[in-house]
Every structure is written in C-alpha cells, then in structure tokens.
Amino acid sequence: MTKHYDYIAIGGGSGGIASLNRAASYGKKCAIIEAKHLGGTCVNVGCVPKKVMFYGAHIAEAINNYAPDYGFDVEVKKFDFSKLIESRQAYISRIHTSYNNVLAKNNIDVINGFGKFVDAHTIEVTLADGTKEQVTADHILIATGGRPYRPNIKGQEYGIDSDGFFALTELPKRAAVIGAGYIAVELSGVLNSLGVETHLLVRRHAPMRNQDPLIVETLVEVLAQDGIQLHTNSTPSEIVKNADGSLTVRCDGQSDVTVDCVIWAAGRVPTTDKIGLENAGVETNEHGYVKVDKYQNTNVKGIYAVGDIIENGIELTPVAVAAGRRLSERLFNNKPTEYLDYSLVPTVVFSHPPIGTVGLTEPQAIEQYGAENVKVYKSSFTAMYTAVTQHRQPCKMKLVCVGKDEKVVGLHGIGFGVDEMIQGFAVAIKMGATKADFDNTVAIHPTGSEEFVTMR
C-alpha cells in the first residue's frame, strides 16, 4: 500500500530538513528522502568539514607564523593528518546523530533511497537493496542540492573534486587547485597552511572577481605573501598522468604545472537531471536549475524548490534553511505572504585571511545609483594579532554609501577575524542604517570591527 504524506522533501540537506522540521511542528505528516547522508553537501562535503579544515590550518599558521614572536618555541615533530580527519568525521557523525534524533522527535519518516517523480504527487524511491516503493504527498519539496562540476577535457578523471578533497587520507606534497571561486580559494588556503606546495589556477586575471575590487586586490597580495602560486589566465586543456604518478596540468598559452594532486573547484551544477522532473512537468532552465517564483513555487501546483538547485538563487546553506522555513510557514501556518527576501545576504569566504561581505560592491553601487550618488569609505591597517610578529597580515575594509543620507548599501572586509564581524553589521544594513548611524555607535577597542564605525 502506498504511504501518503502531507509533505515530502526529496533531499535530506539543510533546506529540506529545516522545512520539514518546521512543517512537523505544525502537526503535518512528513517524510524526507535521502540517497546518501543526512545533512547534504554542507554537513558532509561542504561547510562543516571545510570549517574544521580551516581551523586546522589556522592552528598550523599560529604555530609556524606567529608563535615565535609571542615567545613560544614550538617544535612540531609530526603533523598527523589522519588524526585531523578522524576528529572531523567524528564531529560529522555527531551531527548525523543529532539530525536523526530531531527528525525522530518530530515524527518525520526518513526514507533512505533515491527519489524520482512518477507524477506531480507520486515519488518512486529506489532503496539500498534495489527494491522500489512509492510514496505520495499533497506537497513536495525539491531540495536535492548540487554537485561539483568537471570540465570535459582529456584527463579530467585524474583530478579529484571538492568531494574528493574531503576523502583524502593523506596530504599530497604538491597540489593544483583549479577554479576562481570561494571553494578554490578556501581549499588552496588550507593546503598551503598545512605545508602543501599549492598552485591556484584561475581562468582570468584574479580569483573571486565578483568581490569588491579592494577585496580582490588584497587577496591576491596575501596569496603571494603566503606562498600560494597563483596562475592567472590559465584554462586547463589537458591533464597528463606521468610515469611516476605525478600529474601535469596543461594550459593553452601558459606554462605546464606538475603536481601530485589536481583538485577541480570550478563551480557546481544542480542535481536535478535524474529525479524525473519531466514526469511531474517541472520546468528548469537550460542548465538544469529549477524555475521558481519568490514564494519558492515551481510551475506545478504543490511542488516547490529551495537551495542550490533554484534559478538565480544563492548557493549558501543559511539561504536554503531560511527559504525552507518560510515556505513551511506559508504552507502550514496561515502566512500566505511569507517568503525569503534574497537581497542583502551576508557571506563569508574562509580564506586566509577570511573575507566578509554584505550588499553591493562599489562598481555595483555605481551602476545602480550613478557615480555621483555613491560615496566610499575605506580603512587599511595591520591586524593586531599579526602586527606584533614578523608575519604581518593586512586588513582592509570598505563601506559603500549612497544618497544624501549616505545609506550604507555595501560593507566589505578582508582580514583576521572579519568572518565573525559581518553578521551584526548585516542586521544594521538590512534595517537601513546610514553612515551617521555607524558614526554614532561607540567603537570597541582594540578590535578590527571598530574600523567599520570610525571611518572618515
């Protein structure tokens, strides 16, 4: 007999889990279909393990770059990479347990299998043993997330992707990270800090090109200072496996790069191609992203989508969580106008040092408001944590303001501790704070964040 639910999520990542937990709190009968591990990309091969690796790299930096000038004579006889991985995976396992406990408490059924639409209200699930079962629901959420992109070039199979990075059991001596986005920059920083000879290959003139120019310029400066070898205007045309097991990355018009490990970090694609969207009549664009309106509705009544798979979305875990919860509020808690405002979403890149940003870059503000209506404030200093050492690191910040009242429409920073500064400022900017509001806030000294309220 086919089991019927009020609400089903295909995909047990952050967005699906958040939406179902909220729906269940209103007494709805829910099920989540997940083919791999609960938590999706974020918990298993994304935010969580990435942040653990960031912290591990941070400790290595403290020992190697800063400890001597703070009076610590530290000698690390051995770095046990396997211990770091063991600790990381144990932490992830505890998160899995927590998810299972919360879902069980909320009486949400967890169906371990691969879900595929049969029609607009029916999903066929292929279980681990190969058997199939069908479930139906009044409301279905597509939350299948994304997967790493690999280019179609000769030898691409010799490289690993970001998922493969988190499957490494030992560190390579030399690595080439291919990509210009935040994933590539973050992985490069981790590898370099842990002692790997690291090459970062980007297609154009710099990584993170969509960031504010001040951030991009400073990032490039720090990459060079820290020893990451940046290869610009480098588009791989072939990966060659050599007799000694090493890999050579060949780029048109550029020098070859020979390493022990190649990591593809050149973007992600939506995991929507095998879930039978055509059977339900759900529309996607030419790249497989699901078309939705501001309420997360697809073109098919009763089918919704959140997270990395939606067209023109923001591929961040908190965005999927927020959209999923608001969707359940609208569907099951009598809030028909509830939706997520996708503007002014704060973001952080866990580079070395980290980047934090919310709102418009200076070029974006000029394009939107006109140069005559934009005023920019900047600050440049050395992070105090590093200022007392020989390994000084820059910290740079910018406020982008518009109009006579100088409304703050953009805030950007790169430097030690910036990742933990941005959240509160995002609240202020979301509320419409002006430069005068920032000026009227007493600074906390000595901190990096005080620069945002003392710029002139």
Curated annotation (Swiss-Prot):
Its EC number is 1.8.1.7. Disulfide bonds join 42-47. The active site is at residue 445. It catalyses: 2 glutathione + NADP(+) = glutathione disulfide + NADPH + H(+). GO terms for biological process: cell redox homeostasis; cellular response to oxidative stress; glutathione metabolic process. Transmembrane segments: none annotated. The keyword Ligase does not apply. InterPro entries: FAD/NAD-bd_sf (IPR036188), FAD/NAD-binding_dom (IPR023753), FAD/NAD-linked_Rdtase_dimer_sf (IPR016156), Glutathione_Rdtase_euk/bac (IPR006322), GSHR/TRXR-like (IPR046952), Pyr_nuc-diS_OxRdtase (IPR001100), Pyr_nucl-diS_OxRdtase_dimer (IPR004099), Pyr_OxRdtase_I_AS (IPR012999). It is found in: Cytoplasm. Belongs to the class-I pyridine nucleotide-disulfide oxidoreductase family. NCBIfam families: gluta_reduc_1, PRK06116.1. This is Glutathione reductase. It comes from Haemophilus influenzae (strain ATCC 51907 / DSM 11121 / KW20 / Rd). The gene is gor.
